[in-house]
Amino acid sequence: DVKDFRINSGYMEVMLSDGITAYQDIGSKDSKVIVLVHGATLGSLAYEEYVNVFLENNYRVITYDQYGRGYSDRVVNDVNIELMERQLQELIEYCQAENVILYGVSFGAAVVAKYASNNPDNISFIGYQVPLIDSANVPLLSLIKIPFYGDLLSRVLFIPTALKRIKDYEHLMSKKLMDHYLDQFKVKGTEKFFKEFFIGNAMGNRMDNHDVIGNNDIPSYFAYAEDDLEIDSLLVKQAIEKYNNPTVKKYLGGHFFSSGIEKQVAQDFIDSIEKY
C-alpha cells in the first residue's frame, strides 16, 4: 500500500484535488524558487544531486512525486496530461510559489510545458532536459492501447521492460535509489496507473504548448542528447525553434546522459538562469 511505502520517506504530504502528493520544499522562502518535475518512471528521489546544487546556489527548491509514482497516491482514473498539470498547479499554489523557475525532465518537460503555456505570467524561466515532445511514434505505446491485449502487454512486457531499462544504469545509481525505484512497482495500483497513463493523452503532442511559451518570450534552456533513442531529437530541435534565443546544451549518452554528471548538468542550468 502506498501509505506504508511512504512511511519514513522524509517527504511532506498534502491532499490535493486528486490525491495525496508527496513533496519537498527546501530552502529560504525569500529565495527564487525552482520547481523540478521528474519523468515518466523515475520519481523525484532521482534528482537529489540536482537539488543539492540548486540549494548551494541559494535557490529554494520544490520537488514532488507525480501521481502514480514514488510516494504519491496511485490515481487510476482519468490519467491524462490535465491531471499532471493540475497537480503541479495546485502544489505551486499550496507552496505559495510565485515567478517560478521550472525544470522538467523527459515526461516532466511535457508537464511543465503544459503548465507554463497556461500560466506564462507565473514563470520567470523554464528548463527542459531530454524533453518529451510527442510519443506518437513509439510502437510499444500503440500496442498497449489495444483493448484486452494492452492489459496483458502492459503486465508482461512494459513493467519488466521498465525494470530492465533502469538496471542498465545500476552502476551509476545509489542502492537507496535503485531499491526505491524497484519497490515503487510493488505498490498496489502502480501497474494499473501505468496502463492508464500510456493509453491516455499524457504523452501526446506538446508542440502547441512550446509555441505559446515561445511567443511569451519566457527565457528558456534545453539540454538533450542527439543519440537519445527514447526522445526524438528532431522534434526537440523543432521545439527549440519556437523560442527566442534559448540556451541549448547538447550531450552524448542517450536519454540518461546525465547519469554520473548530475552536478555538472544542474550547474549548467543555474549558469543559464543567471545569464538573464
What annotation goes with each model-predicted range?
Residues G104-V112:
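Gly/Ala-rich beta-loop-alpha elbow adjacent to hydrolase catalytic centers
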Residues I26-Y71:
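Conserved HGGG/HGGXW glycine-rich cap/lid loop of the alpha/beta-hydrolase fold
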Residues G253-Q264:
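Catalytic histidine-centered segment of alpha/beta-hydrolase-like enzymes
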Residues D1-I34, E56-Y59, E98, K250, ...:
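Alpha/beta-hydrolase fold catalytic core
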Residues Q66-Y103:
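Active-site loop/oxyanion-hole signature of alpha/beta-hydrolase fold enzymes
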Residues N216, F222-Y224:
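Short beta-strand/loop motif that positions the catalytic acidic residue
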Residues S117, I123-L153:
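Flexible "cap/lid" loop of the alpha/beta hydrolase fold
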Residues N137-P139, V156-G214:
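Conserved alpha/beta-hydrolase catalytic His-Asp/Glu region
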